[in-house]
């Protein structure tokens, strides 16, 4: 990533009163977790289940039509990718760069990494749920109430900061993930001084919103290292 872009991103984040993060599978992949491929991590962590159940990737196991297979994979996934998760350098850097501001996360990732990395769980909207839901009695009892409360909190934050500096980080959100992209574009459109920053491999496209845009096509991990080096 060009140093000039790193400086612009660092300035946008440092000056922001509100930072809204949208994250999808690309962020997980940048951390080394790929739900779609039988890579080394898959065989090391799920190899026994894969051989027993005839499964070729994590997502296939989690979405198996066999309820028993789904349960086994969800339990292993929750244990390995949430309970035993240690925040990656990328996630730690993301936290450091955003912790000074009001931060809100919208993610379709089901591993709960943001919560484990220290982000406020009441400001982490998981659009496709999480393996944590199987052991969270509040979510089991009131699955929609928490999401509604989180949406209200996002609306409150946007209203409070609509005339201030707002930074939007779109992290590895594919073109087909319309839910997250629409929500981020709505935030950008509602805020007077928004900077929309997109990180993606070969799909770093400007949002449907009229605001300053910075596009980064490439690996997120070294990009965030470069941004962090710009911070005094």
What are these regions (language model features)?
Residues 1-232:
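Conserved catalytic alpha/beta core of Sir2/sirtuin-type deacylases, generalized to analogous enzyme cores
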